[in-house]
Every structure is written in structure tokens, then in C-alpha cells.
Amino acid sequence: MKTKLNELIEFPCVFTYKVMGEAKPELVDLVVEVVQRHAPGDYTPQIKPSSKGNYHSVSITITATHIEQVETLYEELGNIDIVRMVL
């Protein structure tokens, strides 16, 4: 029997996205812009460069209110051109 994500998470809850993308100045702004559309708030993302400096990881934490919000953010963050992966 498969357990669905929404059966494991009780909403509202704190949810952190880790977005890895090219080390371009606009990465953080693009991530925050997408998050603001679905979970408006005051965000201070954490940015960490890769060892060679080609990529940055942007961690941003929201208060998720429902599973559709979580899934939509995964999809839209992944659709940003310079993003390579969303965890």
C-alpha cells in the first residue's frame, strides 16, 4: 500500500524548499517571486554557493496550508529556466 504525501503531513506546516540553480544574480529573486505568488510573506532565503561557484542553492521556508500549494510550488520552482533541481 502506498502512502500519499498528504497523509503524512498535517497542514498548516512549515515546509522548506531547496532550489539549486545556476549562480546568476537573478536566481534568488526568481525563487522568491514564485513563492510569493502562492504563499505571500516576508522571506529571507539562505544562499549557499557550490564548491566551484557554478551553482547556488537557495533554501526558503514557507508555512504550507494545503498539499496543492506544496505540489504547485515544486512544479513552478522547477520551471524556472536557470533552476536545475528542487528538493
UniProtKB/Swiss-Prot annotation:
Coiled coil: none annotated. PANTHER family: UPF0250 PROTEIN YBED. InterPro entries: UPF0250_YbeD-like, YbeD-like_sf. This is UPF0250 protein ECA1299. It holds the Pfam family DUF493. Belongs to the UPF0250 family. One of its GO terms (cellular component) is cytosol.
